[in-house]
Swiss-Prot record:
Domain PPIase cyclophilin-type: 7-163
Top EC class, one word: isomerase
Reactions accelerated catalytically: [protein]-peptidylproline (omega=180) = [protein]-peptidylproline (omega=0)
Gene name linked to the record: PPIAL4G
Superkingdom of source: Eukaryota
Family the entry assigns: Belongs to the cyclophilin-type PPIase family. PPIase A subfamily.
The protein's role, per its UniProt record: PPIases accelerate the folding of proteins. It catalyzes the cis-trans isomerization of proline imidic peptide bonds in oligopeptides.
Locations listed in the record: Cytoplasm
Keyword annotations of the record: Cytoplasm, Isomerase, Rotamase
Enzyme Commission numbers on file: 5.2.1.8
InterPro entries given in the database record: Cyclophilin-like_dom_sf (IPR029000), Cyclophilin-type_PPIase (IPR024936), Cyclophilin-type_PPIase_CS (IPR020892), Cyclophilin-type_PPIase_dom (IPR002130)
Gene Ontology cellular component annotations, sorted alphabetically: cytoplasm
Name this protein carries in UniProt: Peptidyl-prolyl cis-trans isomerase A-like 4G
Organism lineage string: Eukaryota, Metazoa, Chordata, Craniata, Vertebrata
Amino acid sequence: MVNSVIFFDITVDGKPLGRISIKQFADKIPKTAENFRALSTGEKGFRYKGSCFHRIIPGFMCQGGDFTHPNGTGDKSIYGEKFDDENLIRKHTGSGILSMANAGPNTNGSQFFICTAKTEWLDGKHVAFGKVKERVNIVEAMEHFGYRNSKTSKKITIADCGQF
């Protein structure tokens, strides 16, 4: 399986912040990577485009991927509502690691987060399946719009997304 590269064009209250590119670890975590890739391209009829990062905690992560509700309560994968943890071999080694958000074992859907720091306490609990390849500074800039209580001060949106 090819390690595809995904792009997100990020806006803050409708103003462009920049484009990040994310390399997936599809060779090791193919099912999770395919879910993220297909949700980025929209080829299954639903996608990340237009969804927001609803939870940003400085020094921890930026979470998004809820395209059914803007508040983090929605979670839909290309395989149905939820799918199992594929493998937990990748570690949350630092800023830029892409991982699945979940509500416990085997509850992956569409929601994901991008780490902004080393988060080793997530190892073995969340599937890390990619890494920001270019423009991690955009993710770090997104942190400035988050609070410790996970709320955001501005609307951080995936204005466009797809596969290179």
